[in-house]
C-alpha cells in the first residue's frame, strides 16, 4: 500500500546469509549501492573478513591495453553470438600517454618515468607512491622499476618489490652490467630494505615480465628454471620445470594453478601448455596443444616466428595476441571463437601480462591522500 515499507525477498532471509552469500558475490559498485540501503549491510560489508572474502569471489580477468587506456575482459564467459567484450578500467588523460603497471588484489601500481601511483579502480582511490632513490652504478644510465606488489601475510601490509638497475650505453656498452639491487618497501613508507638475489644470474632481471601470483609467492620464468619470491620470508629461491622444453618458456596464470607454455617447433605454429601438478614436489604434466595452422580464424592468422601471448579466461577459453594488435578468442582445442571487441570500439588492442580481480581493499596511503590538501593529479581517470 502507498507509504508503507515494501516487503522484499531479502527481508525474509537471515542477515548473515544476505551479507555472506549474496552481497559477497556482487561487483564492488553494487556493494557500495547496497551499503546505502541499510545500516546493517554497511557495517557487515565493511569488515576486513568480508572485504577479503568478497575479493576471492570475484573473477580474475585478463587486462587489455589500447591507445586510450587500460581495459579488462568483461566476464569469464561469453556467448557465441555476442563474442568476448572488454570494459574500461582506466582512461589516460591524453592520447599518447603510456604507463607501465603491475597488479595485486585489485590494486594497481602505475608508473611513467619517475612518477608512480597506486590505485584501486573499483573504489576509485588513488595516491602518489614514493620510490627508492636510484643507486650508484658505474654506468650513467640507471633506473628504478616495480617488480611486484604483494600482501605480506604476517603484517597484513602491502609491500612493493623494487629493482634498481644500471644499463650500458655508448662507451659503457663494453662494460659488464652491474647486478641490480632489489629492495622492499611497505606501501606508504620511504624506508627501503635491500634483499639479496640468490645467485649471480646470467638470465638478466625479471623486470621483462610481471610475476605470476600463486600460493603467496611471486613467480618468474627465467632461463631453465623458475625464480620464486617468497612473500612471507621475503627471500628468493629457484623452482624446477621440465628441462626438455628449452630455455625459453612463458608462465601462464590459470586462476587456480601455475602453468607454462612453449613452442617446440621452429616455425612456432604449435603451443604446448604444461600445468604444475604438485607444487611442493615441483612436478609438471602436459595438458594440451594448440595447432595454429589448423585454426580456422576470420580473417586468417598471420603466423610469425614468435610465441604469441596467451591469457586464460576460464577452464576452456583463452585469449591470444595476434600481430600487429589483434586479439583472438579461442578454446583449448584450437577452435576459433571470434575476435575480441571493445564496447567503445577501441582498436589496436594488446594483451597484457596482467590480470585484474576487483576488490574493496584499501591501503593507509589512500586515507592520507584524502586528508592532504595538496593533490598530485595522476595522468589517468578511473572509469570502472
What is the meaning of each model-derived region?
Residues 1-384:
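N-terminal entry/capping and adjacent linker segments that precede and initiate structured domains
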